[in-house]
């Protein structure tokens, strides 16, 4: 499991699909344990779509300095709210950016690796400040840290 602790005190707890998406989960856990996500923001939060974070630049263009392949045969589809998936710029461009869905987004099936699901903190997800990075002047809501809870 992972807990996204927000700077304002809210928390979102996520179950990670390590059996279905082991490379993606390993990358997320590694970055979280290194403190990579500490102080980053939800830089792109679009109504009726998703909340995206994990970019150290806060613009949508940043990452960890490497990319890795997609894991698309997980057996999951974008059929509901609360799915955790990798943001990318096309096939094989996963890095550090992730998103959590607000609604079913079936048009993303086969394009993004789903590697977890929100299990607590839906109120925190709902409370994230809407933000279009192309027009926003204020930074997004700040992630204090992402803590990995071993089960």
Task: Tell where the protein language model's regions lie, with residue ranges.
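Cyclophilin-like peptidyl-prolyl cis-trans isomerases
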Residues: 1-151
């Amino acid at each position: 499991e992972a807990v996204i602790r927000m700077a304002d005190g809210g928390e979102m707890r996520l179950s990670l699909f390590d059996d279905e998406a082991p490379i993606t989960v390993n990358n997320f856990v590694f970055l979280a344990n290194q403190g990579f996500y500490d102080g980053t923001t939800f830089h792109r939060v679009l109504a009726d779509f998703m909340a995206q974070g994990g970019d150290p630049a806060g613009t949508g263009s940043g990452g960890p300095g490497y990319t890795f392949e997609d894991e698309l045969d997980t057996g999951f589809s974008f059929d509901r709210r609360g799915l955790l998936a990798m943001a990318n710029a096309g096939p094989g461009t996963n890095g550090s950016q992730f998103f959590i869905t607000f609604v079913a987004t079936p048009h993303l099936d086969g394009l993004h690796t789903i590697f977890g699901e929100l299990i607590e903190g839906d109120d925190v997800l709902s409370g994230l400040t809407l933000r279009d990075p192309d027009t926003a002047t204020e930074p997004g809501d700040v992630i204090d840290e992402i803590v990995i809870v071993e089960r």
